[in-house]
């Protein structure tokens, strides 16, 4: 009986711990504190955490152009292979998803789940031919939980890309995402 009670307690603690991950929530891009988002103007990010699975849902917009994608990552897996037909991060560069059109993502939690670190490998198709790309991404929530900073270092760049987000209030999250204009 004590063993069963212990197992149930451990299950509840692990479930509540995952649900209470400080990084989970709805986030809105803050352009004045971030690297230029070109070619997009709006970036809303929703992060959900269910056990070992983290879901990153992006909504990007500029004018009438809108792009949405969802990436599910199982942090307990050594590598997550995620299909991706489109690379929206810098479409004005003339670089598109190439190779097998997948991202190989390795993930780990740091700092009591306040920081999610991803290492993503993919192949881009460019005018010069296929180009292997590695992106190191840190999603870090502030100590007070109000700000999320996404720092990305690409193997093709010397300087990191830094995006700052603010946590949406319950009222803001209930409204439809902004389309095409930053706030």
Annotate each predicted stretch with a short phrase.
Residues 6-15:
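Bacterial N-terminal signal peptides
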Residues 19-183:
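Hydrophobic small-molecule pocket/channel-lining residues, especially in calycin-type beta-barrels
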Residues 1-4:
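Positively charged n-region of N-terminal signal peptides that target proteins for export
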């Amino acid at each position: 009986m004590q063993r069963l009670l212990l197992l149930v307690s451990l299950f509840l603690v692990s479930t509540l711990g995952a649900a209470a991950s400080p990084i989970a929530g709805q986030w809105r891009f803050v352009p004045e504190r971030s690297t230029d988002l070109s070619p997009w103007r709006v970036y809303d990010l929703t992060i959900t955490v269910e056990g070992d699975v983290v879901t990153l849902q992006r909504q990007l917009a500029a004018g009438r152009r809108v792009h949405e994608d969802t990436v599910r990552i199982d942090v307990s897996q050594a590598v997550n292979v995620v299909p991706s037909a489109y690379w929206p991060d810098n479409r004005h560069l003339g670089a598109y998803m190439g190779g097998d059109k997948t991202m190989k993502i390795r993930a780990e939690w740091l700092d009591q789940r306040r920081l999610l670190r991803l290492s993503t490998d993919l192949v881009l198709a460019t005018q010069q031919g296929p180009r292997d790309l590695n992106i190191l991404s840190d999603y870090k929530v502030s100590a007070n939980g109000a700000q999320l900073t996404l720092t990305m270092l690409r193997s093709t760049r010397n300087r990191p890309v830094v995006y700052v987000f603010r946590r949406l209030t319950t009222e803001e999250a209930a409204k439809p995402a902004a389309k095409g204009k930053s706030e």
